[in-house]
Swiss-Prot record:
Cofactor binding summary note: Binds 1 Mg(2+) ion per subunit.
Binding site for 2-[(2R,5Z)-2-carboxy-4-methylthiazol-5(2H)-ylidene]ethyl phosphate: 143-145, 174, 194-195
Lineage of origin: Bacteria, Bacillati, Bacillota, Bacilli, Lactobacillales
This protein's GO CC annotations: cytoplasm
GO molecular function, one term: magnesium ion binding
Residues that coordinate or bind 4-amino-2-methyl-5-(diphosphooxymethyl)pyrimidine: 43-47, 78, 117, 146
InterPro entries linked to this entry: Aldolase_TIM (IPR013785), ThiamineP_synth_sf (IPR036206), ThiamineP_synth_TenI (IPR022998), TMP_synthase (IPR034291)
Organism: Lactococcus lactis subsp. cremoris (strain SK11)
Coiled-coil regions listed in the entry: none
HAMAP family, per database record: TMP_synthase (MF_00097)
Protein's name in the database: Thiamine-phosphate synthase
Key words, A-Z: Magnesium, Metal-binding, Thiamine biosynthesis, Transferase
Role description: Condenses 4-methyl-5-(beta-hydroxyethyl)thiazole monophosphate (THZ-P) and 2-methyl-4-amino-5-hydroxymethyl pyrimidine pyrophosphate (HMP-PP) to form thiamine monophosphate (TMP).
Similarity comment: Belongs to the thiamine-phosphate synthase family.
Amino acid sequence: MTNKTLDLSVYFIAGAQNFSECSLDGATQKIALIIKSGVTVYQFRDKGTIYKEQKQRLSIAQKLQKVSEEAGVSFIVNDDVELARELNADGIHIGQTDESVSKVREKVGQEMWLGLSVTKADELKTAQSSGADYLGIGPIYPTNSKNDAAKPIGIKDLRLMLLENQLPIVGIGGITQDSLTELSAIGLDGLAVISLLTEAENPKKVAQMIRQKITKNG
């Protein structure tokens, strides 16, 4: 791990599957460009289903980790604890159906950031004492970026959930440019986005917009 602080404000999530029209090299290049556009965190969310050989996935993860390090961006691995350990990533992010936070913490140690996804109020309550370093709450709005996404929380219930929270929070799910102002006013530490950046004509402009909204109201 090289990044000792975690700025959650512009949290980018993607894998090669988010650029299905591209070759693996093309997808990797597009992700690298977005990493260098001003994001603060990059989460390598790549389930490995599109590779002929798993060593291709490791190679791409290593390339994107290097890009992240050079850009001063925290590199976090989604779900795959062994990959996070092999890469000595800055962090690991897990969901409610993965191994428990305590078990993952035993494997990765105290030096690696550990994020946990939360989809409803009772999960948020339990997460407070789980040992996670930060939480990803969502989906806030309906989203097409994740096939197995839970029911949208909505801005009203999200506000109520945040009143009971003591941990750094990243909002995720269906975030568009039109929703940035609404989201910036409720006390989130960052916004996690996929399509808002992968489909942007100017990722740098979008990343700057997110950061300005979050830091202005943070």
